[in-house]
A protein has these predicted regions:
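A eukaryote-biased signal for long
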Residues: 73-191
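Structured domain cores in non-transmembrane regions
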Residues: 28-102
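Short N-terminal edge-element motif at the start of the domain
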Residues: 1-43, 51
Length: 191
């Protein structure tokens, strides 16, 4: 399913279209689990993002790595808030939405220039470059009194990461740029 995100942190007045596979399961107690599968940026309309990404590409190395991984996290957060706000749940006893993201523990990114209706945009796609996986777990509900959204995100190591042990398979993609290192995308993960 495609979602149009206009709430990405740092990019007001921009729209990012993401393709997401997910399933939703609600238990009898009011908890809804959203298990997110494939997640990718498809297109966007955002001149500032193009400038920021090009600046990161020009700087290269750790600057590019940090930008791409940081932006991916912003997309995850924007999707969580967007999806939650389609049907918000209040923080009554046990009522909440849980977003579960199972991520490759080691990723590297291929950045490709794509022509969309005469406009050249840069899209990044991940590839595994090691073994192991981790989980991003976000729990959300809306406080019925304040109207504020209560949100906690935790990262867990599911299996130990061994980065750099697999060469990334870019498939048929032509990579204009590649992130510098094979990196663990789950910061501050705990077991």
């Amino acid at each position: 399913e495609e979602f149009h995100l206009d709430n990405v942190a740092g990019y007001p007045n921009c729209t990012f279209n993401v393709s997401v596979t997910y399933n939703e399961c609600t238990d009898g107690g009011g908890i809804t689990e959203i298990n997110v599968g494939n997640f990718s940026l498809v297109t966007y309309v955002c001149p500032q993002y193009t400038i920021d990404l090009q600046n990161a590409i020009n700087a290269g190395g750790i600057v590019l790595d940090n930008f791409v991984f940081g932006f991916e996290k912003k997309l995850y957060e924007a999707f969580e808030f967007h999806y939650f706000n389609l049907n918000p749940s209040t923080c009554l006893t046990g009522v909440q939405r849980n977003f579960n993201w199972y991520l490759d523990a080691c990723k590297q990114y291929c950045i490709t220039s794509v022509d969309i209706e005469g406009t050249n945009i840069l899209i990044f796609n991940p590839a595994r470059c090691g073994t192991g996986c981790c989980k991003r777990d976000t729990r959300m509900c809306k406080d019925p009194i304040t109207g504020q959204i209560n949100k906690t995100t935790t990262y867990y190591i599911i299996s130990t990461a061994n980065c750099g042990t697999i060469l990334p398979d870019w498939g048929r993609r032509k990579c204009d740029y590649v992130t510098n290192s094979c990196t663990l995308p789950c910061p501050h993960a705990s077991t």
